[in-house]
Amino acid sequence: MLALKLSVYSVVFFFIAVFVFGFLASDPARTPARKDLED
């Protein structure tokens, strides 16, 4: 049961981290000054 809880928490934390990273990187990535970081 502990392994199941840890796996669920890890998946939830992974999706939250991806969502937060995509939300923070979406606006600066569209500006011409930050285009060099996308390569």
Swiss-Prot record:
Subcellular localization: Cellular thylakoid membrane
Keyword Hydrolase: no
Membrane topology: Single-pass membrane protein
Cystine pairings recorded for this chain: none
Taxonomic superkingdom: Bacteria
GO BP, one annotated term: photosynthesis
Keywords assigned by UniProt, alphabetized: Membrane, Photosynthesis, Photosystem II, Reaction center, Thylakoid, Transmembrane, Transmembrane helix
Cited InterPro entries: PSII_PsbI, PSII_PsbI_sf
TM annotation in the entry: 6-26
Annotated GO CC locations: photosystem II reaction center; plasma membrane-derived thylakoid membrane
Predominant location: membrane
Quaternary structure, from the entry: PSII is composed of 1 copy each of membrane proteins PsbA, PsbB, PsbC, PsbD, PsbE, PsbF, PsbH, PsbI, PsbJ, PsbK, PsbL, PsbM, PsbT, PsbX, PsbY, Psb30/Ycf12, peripheral proteins PsbO, CyanoQ (PsbQ), PsbU, PsbV and a large number of cofactors. It forms dimeric complexes.
Family in the record: Belongs to the PsbI family.
The protein's role, per its UniProt record: One of the components of the core complex of photosystem II (PSII), required for its stability and/or assembly. PSII is a light-driven water:plastoquinone oxidoreductase that uses light energy to abstract electrons from H(2)O, generating O(2) and a proton gradient subsequently used for ATP formation. It consists of a core antenna complex that captures photons, and an electron transfer chain that converts photonic excitation into a charge separation.
Protein name as catalogued: Photosystem II reaction center protein I
Organism listed in the record: Prochlorococcus marinus (strain MIT 9303)
Species classification: Bacteria, Bacillati, Cyanobacteriota, Cyanophyceae, Synechococcales
Gene assigned in the entry: psbI
